[in-house]
């Protein structure tokens, strides 16, 4: 039987229509060279900057350089698994990480994979790591406080929700200790049912020792703070690419809380090592070096990260993301490249000094050059009532103390002012991992500023404070409750407090 051409065409059309096969176009390139965590790839003509590519071994890469005839990608994992000649395929995706409450209590790597041995994370939502910072209209001014539990900070350098406050100082001056204390201090708010009081915490370890990260996680677990904390770890032994993306990944996790009307606090520990990792990547990508061999866009590296911290407007849910970046200085040099960059991006800095630390003033906050540019608007009225004069009194004390070294003859008024200053410094000292509720801080500062400590020997100020707070917790709870609920010291509360303190000072001074 002879078929006509038109019949042949119809049969072929039917057969083709019955074939249920979708052809998938894959763009595949080839690795030209690989080394130091960088792969040079030929053949991916349409790949975009910031796109994820997949190597033959399953390891992922992030495209950072687009050149005339090739592209360069940083390998996010073990570069020994990538060899010259391997095929590389486009994923047509940008880098995403899991977000949500399922991550709370977990330790994850820079890509959001769990590394704590507690099984998979059941997260339903993913977010891009390089999200755009909120615009001006979407934001509102900082108005609610973040209580760190540290007297020297909550009274003199207050931090507000949505603020970016830099913690800067030499190594071993207690920068991480302030950050960890702030996380532990949020436990009190998490014991309440009101969601608007709670602050979820994210701690990002960049280029730290594994032992240090394990120690911090252990401390947070012991304090019961891991229940509301995510730890993102990109340790010194991991690829520079993972250290580079870790803060952005963690920031996306924090933005989930911010954009859903909740409050989050993110700690970047530390951005000096982050800049070093980015410098390493940039130099290996043959980008031109600038000052201190950092690339020209190192300012943008940190500004695009820190601008994502914000207090959102009412229309956007009233959420907030507060950032505490940490910078390590060399021999107290705050005028180096990275410290000055981050100081200019943030809304203030807490400067920790080695000299004060070795003198036993801990936390070693230099009150003179530490500043909070927006936090005072968030400070509660009760704290303003007692802390208003502290900064000035401490500045006058430092000046008088430096002059008193030159001569021994001091008039009684100057001597009294120096003695008062020494007691103020003493009352601002605080043990590590012992954050105080704000109402107890207010009472301690009230005692210091109203000169109740003048008759207490200097070496016994800490003992006096501990005994006084214990007595108030046991027998004068109404004073604490009044300050906590009213958020100010009412006349009635002040009268009660004065009567209690006068009796307590008399009783303490006659103690053996």
From Swiss-Prot:
UniProt cross-references to InterPro entries, sorted A to Z: ATP_synth_asu-like_sf (IPR023366), ATP_synth_asu_C (IPR000793), ATP_synth_asu_C_sf (IPR038376), ATP_synth_F1_a_nt-bd_dom (IPR033732), ATP_synth_F1_asu (IPR005294), ATPase_a/bsu_AS (IPR020003), ATPase_F1/V1/A1_a/bsu_N (IPR004100), ATPase_F1/V1/A1_a/bsu_N_sf (IPR036121)
Signal peptide: none
Membrane topology: Peripheral membrane protein
GO MF, one example: ATP binding
Pfam families in UniProt: ATP-synt_ab (PF00006), ATP-synt_ab_C (PF00306), ATP-synt_ab_N (PF02874)
Keyword Ligase appears in the UniProt entry: no
Residues holding ATP: 169-176
Subunit structure: F-type ATPases have 2 components, CF(1) - the catalytic core - and CF(0) - the membrane proton channel. CF(1) has five subunits: alpha(3), beta(3), gamma(1), delta(1), epsilon(1). CF(0) has three main subunits: a(1), b(2) and c(9-12). The alpha and beta chains form an alternating ring which encloses part of the gamma chain. CF(1) is attached to CF(0) by a central stalk formed by the gamma and epsilon chains, while a peripheral stalk is formed by the delta and b chains.
Matching PANTHER family: ATP SYNTHASE SUBUNIT ALPHA, MITOCHONDRIAL
Catalytic activity: ATP + H2O + 4 H(+)(in) = ADP + phosphate + 5 H(+)(out)
Protein's gene: atpA
GO cellular component, one term: plasma membrane
EC number: 7.1.2.2
Cellular compartments annotated: Cell inner membrane
Site for Required for activity, residues: 370
Membership in a protein family: Belongs to the ATPase alpha/beta chains family.
Predominant location: membrane
Purpose of the protein: Produces ATP from ADP in the presence of a proton gradient across the membrane. The alpha chain is a regulatory subunit.
Protein name in UniProt: ATP synthase subunit alpha
Annotated SUPFAM superfamilies: C-terminal domain of alpha and beta subunits of F1 ATP synthase, N-terminal domain of alpha and beta subunits of F1 ATP synthase, P-loop containing nucleoside triphosphate hydrolases
Keyword set, alphabetical order: ATP synthesis, ATP-binding, Cell inner membrane, Cell membrane, CF(1), Hydrogen ion transport, Ion transport, Membrane, Nucleotide-binding, Translocase, Transport
Keyword match Ribonucleoprotein: no
Taxonomic lineage: Bacteria, Pseudomonadati, Pseudomonadota, Alphaproteobacteria, Rickettsiales
């Amino acid at each position: 039987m002879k078929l006509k051409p038109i019949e042949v065409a119809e049969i072929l059309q039917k057969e083709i229509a019955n074939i249920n096969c979708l052809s998938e176009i894959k763009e595949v390139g080839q690795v030209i060279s690989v080394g130091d965590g960088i792969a040079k790839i030929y053949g991916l003509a349409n790949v975009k900057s910031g796109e994820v590519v997949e190597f033959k071994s399953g390891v992922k890469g992030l495209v950072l350089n687009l050149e005339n005839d090739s592209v360069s990608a940083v390998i996010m994992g073990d570069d020994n698994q990538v060899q010259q000649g391997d095929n590389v395929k486009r994923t047509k995706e940008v880098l995403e990480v899991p977000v949500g409450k399922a991550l709370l209590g977990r330790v994850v790597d820079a890509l959001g994979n769990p590394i704590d041995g507690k099984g998979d994370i059941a997260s339903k939502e993913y977010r891009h790591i390089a999200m755009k910072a909120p615009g001006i209209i979407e934001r509102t001014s900082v108005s609610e406080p973040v209580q760190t539990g540290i007297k020297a900070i909550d009274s003199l350098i207050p931090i507000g929700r949505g603020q970016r406050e830099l913690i800067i100082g030499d190594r071993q001056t207690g920068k991480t200790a302030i950050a960890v204390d702030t996380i532990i201090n949020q436990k009190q708010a998490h014991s309440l049912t009101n969601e608007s009081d709670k602050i979820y915490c994210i701690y990002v370890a960049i280029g730290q020792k594994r032992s240090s990260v394990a120690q911090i996680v252990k401390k947070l677990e012991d304090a019961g703070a891991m229940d509301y904390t995510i730890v993102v770890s990109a340790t010194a032994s991991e690829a520079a690419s993972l250290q580079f993306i870790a803060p952005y990944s963690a920031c996306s996790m924090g933005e989930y809380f911010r954009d859903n009307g909740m409050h989050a606090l993110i700690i970047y520990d530390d951005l000096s090592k982050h800049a070093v990792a980015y410098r390493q990547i940039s130099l290996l990508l043959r980008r031109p070096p600038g000052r201190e061999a950092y690339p020209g866009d190192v300012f943008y590296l940190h500004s695009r990260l820190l601008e994502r911290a914000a207090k959102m407007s009412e229309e956007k849910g009233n959420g907030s993301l507060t950032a505490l970046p940490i910078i390590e200085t060399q021999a107290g040099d705050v005028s180096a490249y990275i410290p000055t960059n981050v100081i200019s991006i943030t809304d203030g800095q807490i400067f920790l000094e080695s000299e004060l630390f070795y003198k036993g003033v801990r936390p070693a906050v230099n009150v003179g050059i530490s500043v909070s540019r927006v936090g005072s608007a968030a400070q509660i009225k009760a704290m303003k009532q007692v802390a208003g004069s502290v900064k000035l009194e401490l500045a006058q004390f430092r000046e008088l103390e430096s002059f008193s070294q030159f001569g021994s003859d001091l008039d009684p008024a100057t001597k009294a002012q120096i003695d008062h200053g020494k007691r103020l410094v003493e009352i601002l000292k605080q043990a590590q991992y012992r954050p105080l509720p704000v109402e107890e801080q207010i009472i301690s500062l009230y005692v210091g500023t109203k000169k109740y400590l003048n008759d207490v020997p200097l070496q016994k100020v800490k003992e006096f404070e501990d005994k006084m707070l214990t007595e108030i917790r046991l027998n004068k709870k109404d004073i604490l409750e009044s300050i906590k609920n009213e958020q100010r010291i009412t006349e009635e509360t002040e009268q009660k407090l004065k009567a209690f303190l006068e009796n307590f000072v008399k009783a303490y001074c006659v103690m053996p």
